[in-house]
Amino acid sequence: MLKNDLFLRALKRQPCSRTPIWVMRQAGRYLPEYRAVREKTDFLTLCKTPELATEVTIQPVELMGVDAAIIFSDILVVNEAMGMNVEIIESKGIKLTPPIRSQADIDKLIVPDIDEKLGYVLDALRMTKRELDNRVPLIGFTGAAWTLFTYAVEGGGSKNYAYAKKMMYREPAMAHALLGKISGVITAYVLKQIEAGADAIQIFDSWASALSEDDYREYALPYIKDTVQAIKAKYPDTPVIVFSKDCNTILSDIADTGCEAMGLGWGIDIGKARAELGDRVALQGNLDPTVLYGTPDRIKAEASKILKSFGQHTEHSGHVFNLGHGILPDMDPENLKLLVEFVKEESAQYH
């Protein structure tokens, strides 16, 4: 039995004594303890060494007091498992080769055996689960098909997604063929993560806002829904969070995927999102990460605004406090610690 199951209870919209909190990229460069591990190796080797991935996954639980751990990995391990060469060069960016721009390129991508190609993530999940010893839940994750598609077609990050959109608008059948192939791997991967011990899954659609509403409905949401529904069919008790960053005008469509919770960027008032959705889903978020550059009083004031905006909890409401995106590398860890402690104390009055 989990000693602290608040995160899972909030996702399932069950009564909680307070609002749980974790933050995206909580295992990362803002922590001196993470940097000490990272100095010994490169980023992808850290992801692929279960002992090290376990160590950095647990650091924020012990140092910051967050209510959930998220396995240390990267969304691009899926692209790599499918046969692409992935280079992650800190401060320079991400390079994937060769870029996927033809049907022949798509055909060359493999549909990997998850245990064989991504076994290191599953080993890290199992090891972390043991080390956590039921202290807090463990989150597994994946990138969404659209986001992984953009990396594959662009060959890295992009400002305007020209190659990805060119394929969408000139060769829509080809775009769907690639999205479908990636989506199948994503689904198999998250099911294996749950089998290995993940208590919840988050789907990161980091580049969601690159698409218009109609295009998001056509090229992104159906694939997210496929993955969510596959999880529901096999592991109905495992909650899924969908983080479609800055898709604030189609919240209802995202809820229609069947997810338990929706991650919000900081560009929307969480109270407005709740008013629109009712208590159909739990909400996660949504403090602007740069607030953590602020003074202690300002950090508390901004966090308080979010708790107040979400408002009083009902029998079927759920809120997980988080940032609206990942914590930045130069943040002061003491400011995150202050935020975590403040949310734990301040949120009880709303429950």
From Swiss-Prot:
Pathway: Porphyrin-containing compound metabolism; protoporphyrin-IX biosynthesis; coproporphyrinogen-III from 5-aminolevulinate: step 4/4
Catalytic reaction(s) noted: uroporphyrinogen III + 4 H(+) = coproporphyrinogen III + 4 CO2
Keyword Cytoplasm: yes
Subcellular location: Cytoplasm
GO CC annotations, alphabetized: cytosol
Residue positions binding substrate: R25, Q26, A27, G28, R29, D74, Y151, S206, H325
Pfam families, sorted: URO-D
Group of enzyme by EC: lyase
Function: Catalyzes the decarboxylation of four acetate groups of uroporphyrinogen-III to yield coproporphyrinogen-III.
UniProt subunit comment: Homodimer.
Entry protein name: Uroporphyrinogen decarboxylase
Species name: Pelodictyon phaeoclathratiforme (strain DSM 5477 / BU-1)
Lineage per the UniProt record: Bacteria, Pseudomonadati, Chlorobiota, Chlorobiia, Chlorobiales
Gene coding for it: hemE
